[in-house]
Amino acid sequence: MTVYVETDFLLALAKDSDWLQGSAEDALDEYEVETSAFSYLELVLARERYEFDYVPLVANLLELVPVRDEEEKQVVLKAVNYYDEGMTPFDAFHAATAETRSMDVLSSEKEYDGIEVERVPLDPTDEE
């Protein structure tokens, strides 16, 4: 049986010690598990509290706890790299999603200007 897992499960596996760690490890033996990019986004947000070395952590966790398909996996991996390069977690996931889908991003955020994603300015024009 395949079950969807959320961030508590990922945190239990990622932390050195967690009250759910044993249960999470047992669940890996008992079930096929799957999660989404949202859980990995939440893990990146929790990173500051737990001080994870998140780039290798996420790559390793994706092997244990995959997302639905290869496209979503690419979003997560690219987002973690963008975050590592200084983007906010949310902008990193937006940029990774746009890049993976081969889309431009309509935004006022200048952070997109230095990456693989083409930014279509949302900024007001002189006429407005």
Please provide the spans of the model-predicted regions:
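Amphipathic alpha-helical segments within well-ordered protein domains
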Residues: 41-44, 80
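A generic structural signal for short hydrophobic patches within well-formed alpha-helices
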Residues: 10, 40, 112-113
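Acidic, metal-associated active-site segment
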Residues: 88-104
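Histidine- and aromatic-rich ligand-binding microenvironments
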Residues: 5-6, 34-37, 87-88, 109, ...
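Short, well-structured N-terminal submotif of metal-dependent ribonuclease cores
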Residues: 1-35, 47-57
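Acidic, PIN/NYN-like endoribonuclease modules and their adjacent C-terminal/linker elements
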Residues: 2, 68-69, 99-128
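Short beta->alpha linker loops
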Residues: 38, 70-74, 93
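Acidic catalytic patch
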Residues: 62-84
